Amino acid sequence: SFTLFYYKFMQNNERNDEHFWSHNQGTPLYYNWCGLAFERVCLTHINQIKSALGINGIICNAYSWKSITSTDKTNKGSQIDLVIERDDNVIDLCEIKYTKEKFTIDSTYNDIIQNKKVRFIQEHKTSKAIHLILISANSVCMNEYSEEFQKIIYSDSLFETETLRI
């Protein structure tokens, strides 16, 4: 993880600014790092995500997915942060979102998500049920577009521990 962080964000510190990271807080570089770091946290907390979805007892295969990139501008490639393919014939397509403030899903973002879903179905040729899941670092503004998601999971769910029931 540190090596990835270094080559992506610190290698360009040409002036050897010892406060490089502090000086870059609030910049696009900083928020890009926050988004990638939040994705990595989510990918290491699959069991907690399954718990939040209520699918603890279901065998699942979890992975990230990227479509075949097209050179056709009308048929853009897509990427899904986390796919949870379940043994109960459901596939959860998880969008992992880091924002500093409350996240609002607008029509443009909704179109992007729907395109990802369509591309995934086309390329996998699946007849399984597809659920859209949003995993958000912060709160989400509830509106007509947020209702497209089967479930919204917040970052605090990633750090809950299961209690053993006897």
Short names for language-model regions:
Residues 46, 80-100, 113-114, 132:
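Conserved catalytic cores of phosphodiester-cleaving nucleases, focusing on short active-site segments
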Residues 126-166:
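Domain-level recognition of nuclease-like catalytic cores that cleave nucleotide substrates
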Residues 44, 54, 115-124:
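Acidic, metal/cofactor-coordinating or nucleic-acid-engaging core segments within structured domains
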Residues 99-119:
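Mg2+/Mn2+-dependent nuclease catalytic core
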Residues 12-16, 54-58, 73-76, 90-95, ...:
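Extended hydrophobic-aromatic, low-complexity segments
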Residues 1-80:
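Accessory nucleic acid-recognition modules appended to NTPase machines
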